Amino acid sequence: SETETKAASIEAETVLQFPVSFKFNRPEGRPTALFAEVKFSHYDH
């Protein structure tokens, strides 16, 4: 349905923006490695 398509679009937009936001807001330590993992899987597709 149109509603489901819109929801999927919003979700995809959030997924694409999240790594960028996380890059600038991440604390030191383990989350840095998590970000690298997310970034790698993003470009792997």
Swiss-Prot record:
| Binding-site list for heme 3 | H45
Assigned keywords, A-Z: Electron transport, Heme, Iron, Metal-binding, Periplasm, Sulfate respiration, Transport
Record-level Gene Ontology MF annotations: metal ion binding
Q: What is its main location?
A: periplasm
Its GO CC terms are: periplasmic space
Q: Which residues bind heme 1?
A: H42
One biological process term in Gene Ontology: anaerobic respiration
Q: How would you describe the post-translational modification of this protein?
A: Binds 4 heme groups per subunit.
Indicate where this protein resides in the cell: Periplasm
Q: Where are the transmembrane segments?
A: none
Top-level taxon of origin? Bacteria
Task: Quote the function comment for this protein.
Answer: Participates in sulfate respiration coupled with phosphorylation by transferring electrons from the enzyme dehydrogenase to ferredoxin.
Q: Report quaternary structure and partners.
A: Homodimer.
The miscellaneous remark of the record is: Acidic tetraheme c3 is not a subunit of this octaheme cytochrome c3.
In Swiss-Prot or TrEMBL terms, this protein is called: Cytochrome c3
Organism from which the protein derives: Desulfocurvibacter africanus (Desulfovibrio africanus)
